[in-house]
A protein has these predicted regions:
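Cytoplasmic-entry segments and transmembrane alpha-helices of multi-pass inner-membrane transporters
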Residues: 48-81, 101, 108-115
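Transmembrane alpha-helical segments of polytopic membrane transport and secretion proteins
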Residues: 1-10, 21, 209-239
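Loop-to-helix entry region at the N-terminal start of transmembrane alpha-helices
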Residues: 22-33, 80-108, 148, 192, ...
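Membrane-embedded alpha-helices of multi-pass transport/permease systems
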Residues: 43-48, 62, 96-99, 103-125, ...
């Protein structure tokens, strides 16, 4: 109970909410890192996943590289990127952390996008070709709607990983919630360490919840039970 009181007192301290090293500043930095990293990962990984998923070409190499990337520990990625960024005069903090987080987000998006498209029934795709659909139409009107659930699951995984791992940026002076853990360790402040870990965990869980809700809204029950091609054959408007 005494520790819980210290934790509450830490959060209630006005100093934690104002100034350069306040919670709002580091939360904003954390959100900026994760947001830019996820967008960067999508820009790179989504086209790769769509191409190899739709055509099947280069899939073995791309998926093998993605799996290798997933096997590398997050701190190791940061350890690889940081000295390179110093050599290139990219500095400390935001940019090297962002590059590492983008690299971390790519593998789950690539693998899930590929799997989402390859899991679409081939008979459904061939039926679309028989109806005169081009490759782009097949991708956007058949494969993507049917595989959207698995694709979004990959984005969801990447988002949660990025949010949780962004805290490591504090090691190289990036503004993020990990600052409170690092600073707490340096000053032997157990409530601060626990507060930082609590905020990081809470933000990760919130990200998981938001993407779960997004999946439910985007993948409607009707879309899950009725394929786009079936709706077209039935003459349902909007196809």
């Amino acid at each position: 109970m005494e520790f819980l009181g210290q934790l509450v007192a830490w959060f209630a301290d006005p100093e934690q909410w104002t100034g350069h090293n306040s919670i709002p500043i580091h939360l904003a930095g954390h959100l900026a890192l994760t947001g830019f990293a996820l967008v960067g990962g999508l820009v790179i990984a989504l086209p790769i996943g769509l191409v190899i998923g739709h055509t099947g070409r280069g899939a073995f190499l791309a998926i093998a590289l993605a799996n290798v990337g997933r096997a590398i520990p997050s701190i190791a990625i940061l350890g690889i990127v940081f000295p390179i960024s110093l050599r290139l005069d990219l500095g400390f903090g935001f940019l090297p952390t962002l590059i590492a987080l983008i690299a971390l987000s790519i593998p789950p998006i690539v693998t899930n996008t590929y799997a989402a498209l390859r899991e679409v029934d081939r008979d459904l795709v061939e039926a679309g070709r028989g109806m005169g659909m081009g490759e782009l139409q097949l991708l956007t009107r058949v494969e993507l709607p049917v595989g959207a659930g698995l694709l979004l699951a990959g984005v969801r995984t990447a988002a949660v990983q990025v949010v949780a791992t962004a805290s490591l940026g504090a090691v190289i002076s990036a503004d993020c919630l990990g600052y409170f853990v690092i600073h707490g360790i340096a000053t032997h402040d157990l409530p601060e360490i626990f507060a930082g870990a609590l905020m990081i965990s809470g933000l990760s869980l919130l990200t998981e919840l938001l993407f779960a809700l997004l999946q439910r809204r985007v993948i409607s029950p009707g879309l899950q039970t009725t394929t786009p091609l079936a709706r077209a054959e039935a003459g349902i408007p909007g196809f």
